[in-house]
Regions:
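CheY-like receiver
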Residues: 115, 129-162
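Conserved acidic carboxylate
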Residues: 10
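The feature encodes the CheY-like receiver
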Residues: 64
Length: 162
């Protein structure tokens, strides 16, 4: 069985590269896929079978086009994606309690986190207990017998390029 990938959703190529380097160094067995906006990521989710879903989403909130909150709401609306753990990385001051409904497992401040913080959070999220919980959720949703996740609705808003 192939290892489930980690999805990196980050519009800054420099930060995306930093995340990839740390993932490759500390988690070489886990494939990664980078998306530079929420629309690309959402399109990828719509083409994946449940077995191909990521084990973790590393998500920047302030994305160009639809933001990370828009993507989180979209993921939450489908049983197949609602339980994927999320590591938020943002320069915004976000409270953990308000984000638990989105399956956010940890938040790192983009301006102050260290490589050790990044690796520790990922190890915590991908611990065997967490993986077992996610696997159990995926088994229960397999009863739907769908080959892929139903079509997504996330679209760019005109003039929204912030």
């Amino acid at each position: 069985m192939n290892q489930q990938p980690i999805f990196i959703i980050e519009d800054d190529p420099d930060f995306a590269e930093i995340y990839q380097k740390h993932l490759t160094r500390y988690f070489p067995e886990i494939p990664q896929q980078v998306f530079y906006n929420a629309i690309e990521a959402n399109a990828a989710f719509s083409e994946l079978s449940e077995e191909e879903l990521p084990s973790l989403i590393i998500l920047d909130i302030l994305l160009t086009g639809p933001d990370g909150f828009t993507l989180l709401n979209e993921l939450l609306s489908y049983p197949e994606t609602s339980q994927i753990p999320v590591l938020l990385i943002s320069s915004l001051n976000l409270g953990q309690m308000s984000l638990q409904a989105y399956n956010v497992r940890a938040i790192l401040n983009k301006e102050t986190f260290t490589p050790a913080d990044f690796v520790t959070k990922i190890k915590d999220i991908l611990s065997p207990a967490t993986k077992t919980s996610l696997a159990n959720h995926l088994e229960t949703t397999e009863a739907s017998n769908e080959e892929s996740i139903p079509g997504r609705t996330l679209q760019a808003k005109e003039g929204n390029h912030a």
